[in-house]
Amino acid sequence: MNGKYLQAPVDIFGYLALPKGQGKFPAVVIIPGSGGYQQWMQDTLANRLNEIGIGTLIVDSFTGRGVSETATNQATVPMAASVIDGFAALQALAERPEIDASKIGVTGFSRGGVVSMFTQDRRLVDATIGKNMQFAAHLPFYPGCATTFDKPAPTSAPALFLMGEKDDYTPASQCLSYVARLKSAGAQVSSKIYSGAYHGWISDVKQVTYVPRLQVYSQCDLRINDSGLIRDINSGASTADGWGSFVAAIWKKCGKSGAHYGANESAKKESLTDMVTFFGETLAKK
């Protein structure tokens, strides 16, 4: 983060929902995936959290940028922009009188799960919002772990990674490797894999289908070093060579098109319960 994003601010949108009653509520920022905001996020996640006394803010990073989806080209909205949006949502919630600024967590799906994962890194926190604020809990649903920090510097906040056994878009194996490095760096982090679940198990898509247009980096191991450069461990390709050259190199080396997507009712039910338990214990417990 070099601060250049401050020179061209973008207005983004969010959907705020508060529990019944008054007082300073804990809250969770919800970051959508590559398909952008969808109503099931309010109906499925936000409502469940509101019921246990936790406010929610679903972030829409796409509409303000004139984008509807990023599944076919993730560079349409750079991941760094979505991470900054996540921190901006934290700041916006912290300023509201109804919210307890010390008890704001974050969750997200796929691309949004990456935001939930990356916002746990102390270097990004300090560079973006300073040393006096951070998310209090992180819960990424099936995040993309092809690109991770080589030497993580986690905050003190707890994290829970939720992954699907049969996910061939953002496979659990990549995230388990990163979870191990996070633990070695001192993070309070755990993980859970749901049997039989493909990518998108919590969505409102009822049937698992093969989606040929998805960009998949399931065989990549891309590491962000302490200077912020990304390097492919296998090929040696680096963003030091220029972003365009790097993307072309890793696509040729480890990229492919097509993966499965769709809901799994058993995993959906179980993971919603796990989400409520996690945020209930980390944010709502008196």
Language-model regions, residue ranges each:
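Short beta-strand element of the alpha/beta-hydrolase
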Residues: G14, K24-G33
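Short alpha-helix in the alpha/beta-hydrolase fold that links the catalytic acid
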Residues: P171-R181, K206
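Primarily recognizes the serine-hydrolase "nucleophile elbow" in alpha/beta-hydrolase
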Residues: Y37-Q39, P78-S156, K166-Y169, S173
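Cap/lid segment of the alpha/beta-hydrolase catalytic domain
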Residues: S34-D43, N47-E51, I58-A81, T119-A127, ...
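C-terminal catalytic histidine-bearing segment of alpha/beta-hydrolase fold enzymes
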Residues: Q188-K286
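N-terminal cap/lid segment of alpha/beta-hydrolase-fold proteins
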Residues: M1-G23
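Catalytic His-Asp charge-relay segment
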Residues: S156-D167, V179, S190-K192
